[in-house]
Design a protein with these regions (language model features):
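Positively charged, solvent-exposed patches that mediate nucleic-acid binding
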Residues: 1-127
Length: 127
């Protein structure tokens, strides 16, 4: 039987999530990088773990409808999931701003792909 080529896994397992408030607080308290955009804020901090991890902070104040909040979170998770293997070991917090829910999902996806690429460039050479 031929050996299988290694294919990347695109799961969004618990190991790729920030799970408790102390993990969120560590990033809020001392982010290594801030990427600010009209529609979102990314805070990132290098971690000692094996891979990049994501935390979402989606306030009802910024996105009123629950369905819109869920859609934004789904797009963020999906784009992160596809890019996580190539990102440096870091903890990332994603905070959407007002107006993010008004964008089409395709535009949200494009913005987030650009954000992950910018974050990757920001940490180049530090990991």
């Amino acid at each position: 039987m031929p050996a299988r080529a290694h294919t990347p896994t695109y799961h969004f397992s618990k190991a790729r999530r920030l799970l408790d408030s102390s993990e969120y607080q560590a990033v809020f308290a001392a982010p290594d990088r801030r990427i600010s955009h009209r529609y979102y804020l990314l805070l990132a901090r290098l971690n000692d773990g094996p891979e990049a991890r994501l935390g979402l902070v989606v306030a009802r104040k910024n996105i009123r409808m629950a369905s819109d909040r869920n859609r934004v979170k789904r797009v963020v998770r999906e784009t992160f999931r596809h890019r996580a293997g190539s990102l440096p070991r870091m903890d990332v917090l994603f905070l959407p701003r007002r107006g993010m829910d008004g964008l089409a999902p395709a535009r949200q996806t494009r913005l987030l792909r650009e954000a992950w690429a910018e974050l990757d460039r920001a940490f180049q050479g530090e990991c």
